[in-house]
């Protein structure tokens, strides 16, 4: 049910996981989804998200390919603890989980959880 200021869900709620297109620059479209996954086939740059809305939150699963040791660099709107981009797990097929919350349209606060399986 919904009111002008609140929405209540009795039961569970789920959102799909959108597959990001792998390429030299990866662009997450926050206007289309909250949750994403990407398998890295090389060192990549994650561009600033398109269509970010303050209060939006979600998850990006980052998967190493069979080679592993892939790296990511990040657009200037992504904010990490200590203003330092995190280091990904490097094993072949490793999975890391980036949890994010859009604080403002120019600040996406993030935390990386390494090697979740």
Predicted regions and their residues:
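N-terminal non-cleavable signal-anchor helices
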Residues: 10, 27, 106-109
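Acidic, glycine/polar-enriched metal-coordinating patches/loops
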Residues: 38-117
